[in-house]
């Protein structure tokens, strides 16, 4: 994922920042408690495609 793109993307729910997951397969929105998938290098920013973060993931800094 291009870091410049990551800098301008925001969570569609909270409008807050997103963080790239450690394995670089998801964009994490702590505010919404969601992880948006990245497929073929393209972030899928749909709430219906996102997974809910686990309690442990929500607590990670």
Swiss-Prot record:
Residue intervals passing through the bilayer: none
First and last residue of the signal peptide: none
Disulfide partners: none
SUPFAM superfamilies noted in UniProt: Trm112p-like
GO cellular component, one term: cytosol
Family assignment from sequence similarity: Belongs to the UPF0434 family.
Protein's name in the database: UPF0434 protein PP_1901
């Amino acid at each position: 994922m291009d870091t410049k793109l990551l800098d301008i993307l925001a969570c569609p729910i909270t409008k807050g920042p997103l963080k790239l997951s450690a394995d670089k397969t998801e964009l994490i929105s702590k505010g919404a408690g969601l992880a948006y998938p990245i497929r073929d290098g393209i972030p899928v920013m749909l709430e219906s495609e996102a997974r809910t973060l686990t309690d442990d993931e929500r607590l990670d800094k």
